[in-house]
Each structure stands twice: as C-alpha cells, then as structure tokens.
A protein has these predicted regions:
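GHKL/Histidine-kinase-like ATPase module
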Residues: 13-154
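Short, small-residue-biased leader/transition segments that mark boundaries at the very start
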Residues: 2-6, 179
Length: 180
C-alpha cells in the first residue's frame, strides 16, 4: 500500500492503521503501517501538484451544502497546460466525471469569463476565450455526498444526477465571486 492512500482520503483528520499478517517484522510482529491526512482535499491537491510550479501558493478551498448536497472542492493553478480534475461521490472515485464535474467547470468558466469581461482583459483578443482556456494548469479535487447517486455505465464511474450540477455550480460560483 502506497502513502498515496491516505492523502486521497477526503475526510481530513482520519487515521488508518494497517497490519499485514502475511509479512512479519524481525521481532515477529506483523508488518504495520499508519496513514494520516490532516489536510484532506487541500493536502491532496498539494500532493498532485508537488512537481509543478504553482501560480497560487495555497489551494482555494470550497465547502458548502447546496440543495442538500455537501460539496467540497480544493483547487489550484500551476504553470502546466494540462487540466487535472479528480472527482468523488460518496468517497467513490468517479474518474469519468459526471454531473458534479460539469457543475464545477460551468461555474468556474462563467465566473472567470465574467470577471475577465468586466475588467477589460479580453477586449484586445481577436479570439473567443473558452472554458478550456480557463482550465489550463488547473488541478482540482471535487467531492460530493449524494443521498441517492445515479451512476452511468457498467463501471459506475460517472455521476448522472442532474440536480448535482446546480448544487456544485452554486457552491463554486459563490466562492469564486469572492476572488473576483
């Protein structure tokens, strides 16, 4: 088990002890390991970005409950061109994304585009700026808790609940507006 296990845990402060009875230490006790993540999503974003040059020193953290959906997001920007979004529903990795990722992207794009328009940053551009442009260098971890998740596909790795789009959109928009 790698040290990545606990960092991936979305529940900050949880401590996990593992004992492997198949492998013994020199004193005859089972090999054991302890995993602890104090920082939860923020720590995970820092871990994902540890080899990249940060544009923002500390990740932005969002925690809200909207439409009875608890939403947690940690995000940061780095100097790469790639977007790296990791998402979870009820602690299940939804590596194909889904409605919670759609809500996040929609809110981020709308808020940043509105800010750029109002500040005049886009006036001299001869091209239309898209959501992909705002997500270059973005690292984000999204975690939602959904009472009755509806997963799409056989692998159940994509959230299909349409109401979650609005919940995540609203939570992310509200906090992003504070930065504009």
């Amino acid at each position: 088990v790698g040290s990545e296990m606990c960092i991936r845990d979305r529940n900050a402060g949880i401590r996990i002890f593992l004992k492997d009875f198949r492998e013994l230490e020199d004193d005859g006790t089972p090999k054991s390991d302890e995993f602890f993540s104090e920082g939860g999503l923020i720590e995970f974003v820092k871990y994902l970005d540890e080899t990249r040059e940060k544009i923002i020193e500390e990740p932005i953290y969002i925690e809200a409950v909207d439409q009875e959906v608890p939403v947690q997001v940690a995000m940061n920007y780095n100097s790469s061109y790639a977007e790296n979004v990791v998402s979870y529903v009820n602690t299940i990795n939804t590596y194909e994304g889904g409605s919670h990722v759609t809500g996040f992207r929609r809110a981020l794009t709308r808020t940043l585009k509105s800010y750029a328009d109002k500040s005049g940053m886009l006036e001299k551009l001869k091209i239309e700026v898209s959501g992909d442009d705002f997500r270059e260098g973005l690292t984000a971890v999204i975690s939602v808790k959904v009472a009755e998740p509806q997963f799409e596909g056989q692998t159940k790795t994509k959230l299909g609940n349409s109401d979650v789009v609005g919940a995540v959109d609203s939570a992310v928009s509200e906090v992003c507006l504070l930065y504009t």
